[in-house]
Design a protein with these regions (language model features):
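An accessory alpha-helical subdomain
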Residues: 169-178
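N-terminal catalytic or cofactor-binding beta/alpha core of small enzyme domains
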Residues: 1-145, 156-165, 185-210
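Short conserved micro-motifs at the rims of enzyme active sites and ligand-binding pockets
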Residues: 181-183
Length: 210
């Protein structure tokens, strides 16, 4: 980290996709943009739902002076709790088209990369504060094989190659109630203010001591 560079947390969410007009990950991230948490500014970036485009946005941000942590957010429709993702695997495999209409099968995130990268976020500490606050959450062992997993894997891979040992990882969020209602789904959901609160209380745990 450059001496004197303002310390900040990179917080990302995704654009809406799959016909939706809203994505809770992007909404949560936008609401926390600019907040000071643990003496660090939150810098929010909303990512396109296409793996190459999302990587192109994130890659230069990982080089930024003063970066102390990276927290990616995404949507996991059908899950009832905040999902603290433990691992990202080296594969993209999805039949749901991305924003460019692309589908992939058995494509590595990084050719010849390791099979998986583990989150370096303090997952157990995060789970403890969420549970104490009455927010449903758990440590998840699968982030899927869509864009969320890819951006988590490629971020952890890039940081490792650069020798930047900062906390980084991925958190999945449930549907918003409006999304369940709009599609007449029998699926769990979570209010936006509660999701904002969840991320707001875990971010301080990512800030390393000076």
């Amino acid at each position: 980290m450059s001496v004197g560079a303002p310390r900040h947390i990179l917080l990302t969410g995704f654009d809406p996709f799959d016909g939706d007009t809203v994505n809770p990950s992007g909404e949560v991230a936008k609401r926390l943009d600019g907040q000071m948490i643990g003496g660090c500014a939150v810098r929010t970036v909303i990512l396109p739902v296409q793996h190459e485009a999302a990587r192109a946005v994130v890659a230069p941000l990982l080089e930024a002076p003063g970066l102390v942590a990276v927290v990616h957010l995404g949507l996991a429709g059908g899950r009832a709790r905040i999902s603290l993702e433990r691992v990202a695997v080296n594969v993209m495999d999805y039949s749901r088209p991305d924003a460019h209409g692309q589908v992939l099968c058995d494509v590595p995130c990084v050719e010849d990369g390791p099979a998986a990268h583990f989150s370096t976020l303090p997952l157990r500490e995060m789970l403890a504060v969420l549970t104490a606050d009455g927010i449903p959450a758990y440590v998840s062992n699968t982030a899927g094989t869509y864009l969320c997993n890819d951006i988590s894997y490629t971020t952890l891979h890039a940081l490792g190659r650069r020798g930047r040992s900062i906390p980084a990882g991925f958190i999945h969020l449930p549907f918003l109630p409006s999304m369940v209602s709009a599609h007449n789904l029998e699926q769990p959901s979570m209010d936006l203010p509660l999701m904002v609160r969840a991320i707001e209380i875990v971010l301080p745990l990512t800030v390393p001591a000076r």
